[in-house]
Amino acid sequence: MADTWSIGAHTFTSRLLVGTGKYPDFTTMQRALVASGAEVVTVAVRRLELSKSGEASLLEWIPKGMKLLPNTAACFTAEEAIRTARLGRELEMGDLVKLEVIGDRRTLFPDVEGLVAAAKVLVKEGFTVLPYTNDDPVTAKKLEDAGCAAVMPLGAPIGSGLGIRNPYNLRIIMETVKVPVLVDAGVGTASDAAVAMELGAVAVLMNTAIAEARDPVLMAEAMRAGVEGGRKAYLAGRIPTKLHASASSPMTGLIGT
């Protein structure tokens, strides 16, 4: 039986979601997207060049069959984010939206007050909202109560590559909310993706870790394997941690005893 997961009316098999920014060129981006095995790709609505003559649109390079997840990147107020989400829908990018309301330009941490406010409006307008948020369980619960279809807490600041810095809060969020929890931002390498999945995340979203790797296509393959391995480890169940050793072989029936 396939190990699928769902957000709203959408069901997926791959638990890796990828972005489209920071690649050296469109060809590399396209090859990496294919190598990742991802079914969902996020695109910044405000950065789309849909009508620039003489130049191919970013959307033309996204492999056919991938689900578009428009995002409200670079929005610093709830009002900006709401307008941007509406623009994405006008461009026929669907009901899904990765909601970002940034509160600080240096850290790119979210403005959680504005985020919750924007989420409430967009949910009422029929959007399937996936909010990028901090790793605070209280905020995650407020977003769930606002009607968000999932919550996407950061593992570390966007593009930092620092990995999963606060696994304890992420676990509390997963225990607190009933909607899917996707780890978004901060992943640097495949082991970070595996850790996120081992904690119980439904999926992981990343961009910089693949796009700025020395070999983006190979890193996309590594991230795919990391997510799949972490998911299998979570389902299998790790052994309890212990302070002292526990012999693998029986201590009875030894030679000479």
From Swiss-Prot:
Q: Which keywords label this protein?
A: Cytoplasm, Schiff base, Thiamine biosynthesis, Transferase
**EC number(s) in its UniProt entry?**
2.8.1.10
Has UniProt tagged this entry with the keyword Cytoplasm? yes
Q: Which reaction does it catalyse?
A: [ThiS sulfur-carrier protein]-C-terminal-Gly-aminoethanethioate + 2-iminoacetate + 1-deoxy-D-xylulose 5-phosphate = [ThiS sulfur-carrier protein]-C-terminal Gly-Gly + 2-[(2R,5Z)-2-carboxy-4-methylthiazol-5(2H)-ylidene]ethyl phosphate + 2 H2O + H(+)
CDD domains on file: ThiG
The superkingdom of the source organism is Bacteria
Matching InterPro entries: Aldolase_TIM, Thiazole_synthase_ThiG, ThiG
User: Looking at the UniProt record for this protein, which Gene Ontology cellular component terms does it annotate, in alphabetical order?
Assistant: cytoplasm
Q: Which residues cross the membrane?
A: none
Record-annotated active site: K98 (schiff-base intermediate with dxp)
Task: Give GO terms: molecular function aspect only.
Answer: thiazole synthase activity
The keyword Transferase appears for this protein: yes
Q: Where does 1-deoxy-D-xylulose 5-phosphate bind?
A: G159, A185, G186, N207, T208
GO BP terms: thiamine diphosphate biosynthetic process
- List locations, semicolon-separated: Cytoplasm
**Pathway where it operates:** Cofactor biosynthesis; thiamine diphosphate biosynthesis
Primary enzyme class: transferase
* Family matches, as Pfam families: ThiG
Q: Main role? A: Catalyzes the rearrangement of 1-deoxy-D-xylulose 5-phosphate (DXP) to produce the thiazole phosphate moiety of thiamine. Sulfur is provided by the thiocarboxylate moiety of the carrier protein ThiS. In vitro, sulfur can be provided by H(2)S.
Q: Describe the family membership recorded for this protein in Swiss-Prot or TrEMBL.
A: Belongs to the ThiG family.
Subunit comment for this entry?
A: Homotetramer. Forms heterodimers with either ThiH or ThiS.
The protein's name? Thiazole synthase
